Swiss-Prot record:
InterPro entries for this protein: YspA (IPR010697)
Family, per entry: Belongs to the UPF0398 family.
Organismal lineage: Bacteria, Bacillati, Bacillota, Bacilli, Lactobacillales
Species annotation: Streptococcus pyogenes serotype M1
Disulfide pairings: none
Protein name: UPF0398 protein SPy_1647/M5005_Spy1353
HAMAP family found in the cross-reference section: UPF0398 (MF_01575)
Pfam families named among the record's database cross-references: YpsA (PF06908)
Length: 171
């Protein structure tokens, strides 16, 4: 079994608030290309954390690819309370993350800051690599996860950057 964690910018972090934003289709084209590459190289599990934005779009693409490839999808939420305060539109997306092949909640609820590092350590230990939409020019809290991932020998990282997206949109 080979599992890849998929994570990246949340929609508000890159200013995309409408699913019909033309940038979403460019991002999804890149996702499709990269996920097919993973599948053709033996990956059989895509792991998500349940965030809006990049993960949401990658989940949509992964579900489409299930018609062509034998893949499994999991969502490992940080807390059972994930998404409880979301609006109805976003809760529809949350239901898609809960309708995958495997769902786990790492903690019942928030108690202390160390839960975040424990969660990311768990994700790193349970996956062989990560596909991350992230650019060092636009830092977020993902930088902590990426630092841990880069420190792990043999952990494979594939970054989708703004430069890669620009190249794809021009071709």
């Amino acid at each position: 079994m080979t599992a890849i964690l998929i994570t990246g910018y949340r929609s508000f972090e890159i200013g995309i608030f409408d699913h019909k934003d033309p940038r979403v289709s460019i991002i999804k084209q890149a996702i499709r290309k990269d996920l097919i590459g993973y599948l053709e190289n033996g990956v059989d599990w895509f792991i998500f954390t349940g965030n809006l934005g990049f993960e949401q779009w990658a989940l949509e693409v992964a579900n489409e690819l299930k018609e062509e490839y034998p893949l499994q999808i999991a969502t490992i939420f940080l807390f059972e309370t994930h998404g409880d305060r979301w609006n109805e539109k976003n809760k529809e997306v949350l239901s898609q993350f809960r309708a995958v092949d495997f769902v786990k909640y790492y903690f019942p609820n928030y108690e202390q800051p160390t839960q975040f590092s424990q969660y990311y350590q768990f994700l790193l230990e349970k996956t062989e690599g990560a596909y991350v939409f992230y650019d060092t020019e636009n830092e977020t809290n993902l930088k902590y996860f990426l630092k841990k991932a880069k420190d792990m020998p043999h952990y494979q990282l594939l970054l989708l950057t703004f430069d890669r997206l620009n190249d794809m949109s021009q071709s």
